[in-house]
Regions:
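Conserved ABC transporter NBD signature motif
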Residues: 14-24
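A short, proline-enriched helix->beta-strand linker immediately N-terminal to the Walker B motif
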Residues: 119-123
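Helical segment within the ABC ATPase nucleotide-binding domain
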Residues: 140-154
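ABC ATPase NBD coupling module
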Residues: 25-42, 68
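Conserved ABC ATPase "signature" region
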Residues: 24, 76-95
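Hydrophobic anchor residue at the start of the ABC signature
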Residues: 62, 114, 125, 138, ...
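Conserved small/polar residues in nucleotide/adenosyl-binding loops
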Residues: 2, 6-15, 170-171
Length: 172
């Protein structure tokens, strides 16, 4: 329900509030909510295959938030995308930025989602079932990665999951 509110879904319950840094997100103007979602709150969605745009190169998708919020030029956003893809453990990020989502494995697509969520260095990262449909080894790698990046980016993490194995393993 909270995740639905943050992405702008109409399924959100409106008689309650979601307060973030002193602002009620349920009553904020759409532009303000969009800015907060893009700059201050990062979101890792459950299924990267359906969350990534199949017609856009990975580099454009990772850097999109920087361009939308006018934080960086196209060139700087591209460079930051390469840097962040490297930080999330992508091999050959200079090549990956020119690839499309269907060319990547599930674990690699999830790493792209993590890079997208962190591109604006948010103070809160919401990970909504970030390891669903991944094999156990990749699940652990993704959870370790989120934990490491949480420290590096000094961000809080909300892990949304029904997987008790992930909960017992994680240090988030």
């Amino acid at each position: 329900e909270i995740s639905a509110c943050l992405v702008g879904s109409e399924m959100c319950i409106r008689d309650r509030s979601i307060v973030f840094n002193g602002r009620d997100l349920t009553s904020s103007p759409p532009d303000e909510t969009r800015r907060i979602r893009g700059m201050d709150i990062g979101m890792i969605f459950q299924d990267p295959l359906t969350s990534l745009n199949p017609t856009m190169k990975i580099g454009n998708q990772v850097g999109e938030a920087l361009r939308i919020h006018k934080v960086a030029s196209k060139k700087k956003a591209w460079e930051r995308s390469i840097d962040l893809l490297r930080k999330v453990g992508m091999p050959r990020p200079e090549k990956i930025v020119n690839d499309y989502p269907h060319q990547l494995s599930g674990g690699m697509r999830q790493r792209v989602m993590i890079a997208m969520a962190l591109i604006c260095s948010p103070s809160l990262l919401i990970a909504d079932e970030p390891t669903t449909a991944l094999d156990v080894t990749t699940q652990r790698q993704i959870l370790d990665l989120i934990d490491d990046l949480k420290k590096e980016f000094n961000t809080a993490v909300i892990l949304v999951t029904h997987d008790l194995g992930a909960v017992s393993y994680t240090h988030l």
